[in-house]
């Protein structure tokens, strides 16, 4: 199946679930070609949200990455600028969670950068739900359910880039059959 636009499938890791209080600590994305859904490019950055070593240490433990990785990470403003520079705002955004979109919008707002993506977002959860209904799967279509169904191995459930790549594979399998 061919699409009108390239698809930018993104995933995030956050300090918690509350958009107004918590922060993105990893932003990752894979750009899928509109013609064949193969990965054209990718983006991955951890985000330093605190200068306190104990807070950074907690985030590093949560993400299962070395403390030094987060300590040396760029701030949110720099990450969002790099994200825009890499992909622009023309691809169609895709993600597995509406809250991911809300967190991304909030990140743009916090950095005073314009959020210029199309208001239409490809919702992988809904696509997965329809797929599971069609094939009679009895589980809710979480990403883990779909990873298991398609025999995809996830090594770190808190790695946004790994989740983005596995989500892209799920998307390809659902769309291409």
Labelled PLM ranges:
Residues 91-98, 103-108, 141-177:
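Acidic, Mg2+-coordinating catalytic module of metal-dependent nucleases/exonucleases
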Residues 108-119:
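A short alpha->loop->secondary-structure connector
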Residues 12-14, 124, 164:
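Generic detector of well-ordered alpha-helical packing
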Residues 22-25, 106-110:
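Short, glycine/charged-enriched secondary-structure capping and boundary segments
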Residues 121-137:
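Short alpha-helix plus adjacent loop in nuclease-associated cores
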Residues 2-8, 13-101, 148, 158:
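Conserved non-catalytic scaffold segment of RNase H-like nuclease domains
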Residues 115-117, 137-140:
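Short conserved catalytic/interaction loops centered on acidic-Pro-aromatic/His motifs
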